[in-house]
Amino acid sequence: RSLLHRVDLTDLAFVTIDGEDARDFDDAVYCEETPEGWRLLVAIADVSHYVRPGTSLDRDAQKRATSVYFPSSVVPMLPEKLSNGLCSLNPGVDRLTLVCDALVNRKGETTAYQFYPAVIHSHGRLTYTAVWSALQGEAWGLNTVGPRLGELKRLYALYGVLRAARSERHALDFETEESAADFAADRSEE
């Protein structure tokens, strides 16, 4: 029943890209070049398959609205069995997702898109640091991303085109940095 009416995308090399300390992987990307530009697929974990509307699990998740991360612990929006297990797009396992499948031309314009339920198989858990290192040609990053380098270069090329199109539209750019607290062994702030 789980796979009924889902598109099988397990042959596409989706990857997750998150921070080093991420524990749940709720989105994955795949990009291929087309004659007109790129096909970009963004998959998010299909939590709705496991959390039915109106259930106590659903009500609790609505109250929490998000997971809250502390330096050495987390208060998850969903039980860990879901957030880090069944709904986490871990590498090497098939997972139920909702996918946005978009075509983007060389001017950075989205020419077509559709949403659909799918099954994906993550081919790698990557970090922002490793991806950037690989794109810079550094040995550590290249070793870490391995055979995914070509896909990452396509994603980065698409990013460049989208960034240029955004600039052309004079869109606002909000530069933000993720904040983090460092604590000493005795739990005092450093």
State where each predicted segment sits.
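Electropositive polyanion-binding surfaces
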Residues: R1-E189
